[in-house]
Amino acid sequence: MTFLQLLIIAVVQGITEFLPISSSGHLILIPNFTEFPDQGPLIDVAVHVGSLLAIIVYFFKDVLTLARGGFASIGIGTDRPDAPSERRLFWWIVLGTIPAVAFGLAIKLGAFNSIAETWFNITVIDDDLMSSIRFTDLIAFNLIVYGIALGLADWLGKEVKKFEDMSWRDGLIVGIAQALAIIPGTSRSGVTMTAARALGYSRYESARFSFLLSIPAVAGAGVLIVPEIFEAGATLAMDALIAGVLTFIAAFLTMAFLMNFLKRASMLVFVFYRVAMGCALLAFF
């Protein structure tokens, strides 16, 4: 892959991963607007890992709190005054991660292949459902539907909760929403922010909740792809490394912008963008 292609993929991923407009949808569409070949799942995961590192650095204090909660769960640091609340937040994040892990494993094992072929008339190629549903109409549909859902949740949702107020119920509901983001065009950040806003979290706290919840899921995806990285050869592995580093830079800058933007503005601009892009895809592709 050329450096230009890696740069475009990284910038698109770094921006769209954190804005609620679907990173996977934009990455899949790159070959339609350029002469570049599809970058494939390896580069997709590499840029997601770059995004993950950006989250860890930006929310380092929150990540440290969750880490202390994990240690407190195994009896380390339980004498700290904040240990009970840190432990609680840690376990609610774990609970919220389970739906995405279960859904992802089910897809990987082919549990939904027959449903996709029978109910939705989708031809599953080589038992790979995710590669088989990377098509424009599905992306457009999800951009519009989940964009409208985001707008309604942002309009009707109260702003009374912070991340520290998370209950097991909130963690599970937002976690189930996160599982839906496996489908291209949905937007992991968009669907989790939608769920959090519907539960009464402020815009800023919805984004904070969304990004912290993404850490285990994205890390897990990175771990699963490690064997493929070693099998891919040095050249492709270097491409993945470059893409990951470039994505980290773009993602960190985008996240800083978004968190400040949400302190003073609504999500309406993202709703309009999603609906407009979805309609354009249906009209021209």
UniProtKB/Swiss-Prot annotation:
EC number: 3.6.1.27
Listed InterPro entries: UppP
Enzyme class name: hydrolase
Catalytic activity: di-trans,octa-cis-undecaprenyl diphosphate + H2O = di-trans,octa-cis-undecaprenyl phosphate + phosphate + H(+)
Membrane topology: Multi-pass membrane protein
Compartment(s) where it occurs, according to its Swiss-Prot or TrEMBL record: Cell inner membrane
Stretch forming the signal peptide: none
A GO CC term attached to the entry: plasma membrane
One matching Pfam family: BacA
GO BP terms in the entry: cell wall organization; peptidoglycan biosynthetic process; regulation of cell shape; response to antibiotic
Assigned keywords, A-Z: Antibiotic resistance, Cell inner membrane, Cell membrane, Cell shape, Cell wall biogenesis/degradation, Hydrolase, Membrane, Peptidoglycan synthesis, Transmembrane, Transmembrane helix
Gene Ontology MF terms: undecaprenyl-diphosphatase activity
Transmembrane regions: 40-60, 89-109, 137-157, 171-191, 209-229, 241-261, 265-285
Further facts: Bacitracin is thought to be involved in the inhibition of peptidoglycan synthesis by sequestering undecaprenyl diphosphate, thereby reducing the pool of lipid carrier available.
Family: Belongs to the UppP family.
Reported function: Catalyzes the dephosphorylation of undecaprenyl diphosphate (UPP). Confers resistance to bacitracin.
Protein name, as recorded: Undecaprenyl-diphosphatase
Origin organism lineage: Bacteria, Pseudomonadati, Pseudomonadota, Alphaproteobacteria, Sphingomonadales
